[in-house]
Amino acid sequence: RVSVTSSINTWNENESLNSRIMVAGGGGGGYYNSDANYGTGGAGGGLTGYNGSGTNGPGTGGTQVSGGYDKSASSFGIGGFGYGGIGTRWTYNASGGSGWYGGGGSYASSGGGGSSYISGHAGCIGVNSSGKSLTSTYSKVADSISYTGYKFTNTQMIDGQGYPWTIVKSSASSGMPSPTSASLITGNTGSGYAKITYLGS
């Protein structure tokens, strides 16, 4: 975020959300019920989050321009800009993962994953200072650049299942770098990580 929030405990102020220049999509929540049915949440995405699993209203993944939703009723469980949708049933449900746009909450299945965003990355769609998408369909790199003007170069985007993304998802999974070792991992459990390495002299 280029614009900080007014308080460390406040995450959803519009000016700050609109100024984000790099976002990692989060995975949706899983579910389990008394009939021993269960399912994993949709993985955090590249340009698009993964849909949740299950047959009873799983959440869909967030995209570059909209949040996911409950597949059984598209007007419920809707994720938004910077947050996942909530589960739409009082039990046996799961919420969507956060992200650039969050995944949808479920009815009685698992939640969808959120989408990722990098300002300057081909395929991403930025927003203006009011939080409105610059375009509905990506066509040029300028579409991806945040209104703040800050952007990244030589970018790499890898989703929670280990697939790299440019304008489209790669056909082969490569894994993603582990934040704690030199190994590659597929997805991450627990809290997220930000690893910054100074490359100057």
Give the residues covered by each predicted segment.
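Low-complexity, glycine/proline-biased repetitive segments and flexible coils/loops
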Residues: 1-201
